Amino acid sequence: MNHPRSIAMLAALWLVVSVTSTPVRRSPDLEARRRSAIDRSMIRFGRSTLPVVPPAQPSFLQRYSAPQPAALTADDLMTFLRAYEEDYSSPVSKKSASFVRFGRDPSFIRFGRSVDEENSGYQAETNTYPQRRHRARNHFIRLGRDNELSESNDEDRYEVESERTKRSVVDPCNDCA
């Protein structure tokens, strides 16, 4: 009587262990979406992984010569200060100050809205559209509805001046005296 009970317990234990040890399979599209989201965030916040480059083999002289103490010369200091001045001479907006302070690459700041007009927005993939500055227009273009938006803008631009006058300026009745 003890033997069948132990066999049943062993079978149940084997079943639990086999189910818990098998990894959960995600669908391939879900896995691809997760990976691309991780890649996007790594690129956006400046933590993109560098390509793995094997270390160069040191030459014979480097390998067997006496080690030189790493000293900072005056020329090194001047080049460092010039490079630092060039990097930080441009004004940094309040939004990007923390971005740079946290050690991220300043070239990634352009993802948000920019302060200066010449660099604002980004070019479309086809390079046929003008530079876009507004997110709503981006969504219209992605949906293929940019013609509707441009037609409504043309109508607004060429409005009749009489329609633009205030109601309070127009006399309610011309014959009243």
Curated annotation (Swiss-Prot):
Transmembrane annotation, as ranges: none
Basic and acidic residues bias locations: 159-169
Modified residues (Leucine amide): L143
UniProt feature, compositional bias: Acidic residues: 149-158
Tagged with keyword Secreted: yes
GO annotation (BP), single: neuropeptide signaling pathway
Signal peptide start-end: 1-21
Keywords for the protein's UniProt record, in alphabetical order: Amidation, Cleavage on pair of basic residues, Neuropeptide, Repeat, Secreted, Signal
Tissue specificity as recorded in UniProt: Only expressed in the CNS and predominantly in the thoracic ganglia. Strongest expression is seen in two pairs of large neurons in each thoracic ganglion. These neurons are ventrolateral neurosecretory cells 1 and 2, they project their axons through transverse nerves into the periphery where axons from the prothoracic ganglion innervate the prothoracic gland.
Propeptide segment residues: 22-32, 47-93, 113-131, 145-177
Keyword Cell division found: no
Span list, region Disordered: 145-177
Modified residues (Phenylalanine amide): F45, F102, F111
Subcellular location as annotated: Secreted
Cellular component aspect of the GO annotation: extracellular region
Family recorded in the similarity comment: Belongs to the FARP (FMRFamide related peptide) family.
Biological function: Regulates ecdysteroidogenesis by direct innervation of the prothoracic gland by reducing cAMP production via the receptor for myosuppressin. The neurons that innervate the prothoracic gland during the fifth instar are most active during days 0-4, after which they reduce and then peak again on day 6. Expression suppresses the biosynthesis of steroid hormones called ecdysteroids that elicit molting and metamorphosis.
Protein name, as recorded: FMRFamide-related peptides
Encoding gene, per UniProt annotation: RFa
